[in-house]
UniProtKB/Swiss-Prot annotation:
Active site: H32, D129
Full protein name: UDP-glycosyltransferase 708C1
Thermal dependence of function as given in the entry: Optimum temperature is 45-50 degrees Celsius.
pH dependence (UniProt free text): Optimum pH is 6.5-7.0.
Organism: Fagopyrum esculentum
Protein family (similarity comment): Belongs to the UDP-glycosyltransferase family.
Amino acid sequence: MMGDLTTSFPATTLTTNDQPHVVVCSGAGMGHLTPFLNLASALSSAPYNCKVTLLIVIPLITDAESHHISSFFSSHPTIHRLDFHVNLPAPKPNVDPFFLRYKSISDSAHRLPVHLSALSPPISAVFSDFLFTQGLNTTLPHLPNYTFTTTSARFFTLMSYVPHLAKSSSSSPVEIPGLEPFPTDNIPPPFFNPEHIFTSFTISNAKYFSLSKGILVNTFDSFEPETLSALNSGDTLSDLPPVIPIGPLNELEHNKQEELLPWLDQQPEKSVLYVSFGNRTAMSSDQILELGMGLERSDCRFIWVVKTSKIDKDDKSELRKLFGEELYLKLSEKGKLVKWVNQTEILGHTAVGGFLSHCGWNSVMEAARRGVPILAWPQHGDQRENAWVVEKAGLGVWEREWASGIQAAIVEKVKMIMGNNDLRKSAMKVGEEAKRACDVGGSSATALMNIIGSLKR
């Protein structure tokens, strides 16, 4: 089987002309899809000018994925779409539906060569989600595969270490050479359980990171300097390929938020707090009410994206009923309660002066590009380590003791982040560094240009 697959892509068939043909393979969920759409858009445009095939895993889970994919191909007619069908297992009680989809992708990745071999012109390289690492690196060893991780460099280090971590105790901080220790509270509990569904496919793919041509990270040199230096020194994990920061990637342009932008235009500069916990973080009704009462007491203008279900199509809640008439009216006097916004448009508005965030990595990079300070409220997964990175880089502060009865803490922290001039200056400095990194001649732009240049030789 392997012999048949590898002979489909002998090294001599790789394209060597001035327009490399690259395949971009995204994972599942908006947290994975968004950076891959940004990458595909960048690679198809100047100065990279690649022929791009974008692989879409079918079926999709959320309405947001469907909407963004449809919009993307409408605005990028030169990018070829390749659907890759996987079999989704039946829903299981207490198992994250996204984990089930991640596993189905990982288990199906070995079938990709059959689909890729039919593409024309021949492929120069693949840029893939980590879920495809084992399948691609074992069946297509002659084809350069750049694993693109959708989290921070620091959390990627932890993922790479999971094969060792799953054998260790969760009672003490995890020490990885060259890096500050990882507190156990920051590490997802499943990482200590090799039988957990997420841990099992993470281990399967992490073992094959060494066969990737490189590890691409949506971060930049000055944001995670110690981690990037340690990873590339060989002291942290000796068998990793080069770890290359290529961010923050330019985001796609969307239609402006007609309902919110006029309201924002009327607010004083840096006076609005943007509140969002991402596409996969659903809060309980009690948490939502606590946060709502805290925001109301803070007397701060805000835009709040309220989410009560992990999967958007399952979110049937009515905001007025959720908050109750009295609190809903009070909140509506000070801000906007919505189900969805164009986040990059909101963060880029001059009226927005702070971001109460779960610290999903896409949100962190979008705030970093614009120098918007973050008040971190991580919920699960990589978010606690991402919050650690945010605080260390000077982009925000991390309140580590959020709990029930948080109204007073909300009031205190919101006032702190909206009125802290030192933090605002620090965040603006991060924004300037992010802009330099992704501008022509910057460290991230140059790194990606060097990769594409190597495919033309």
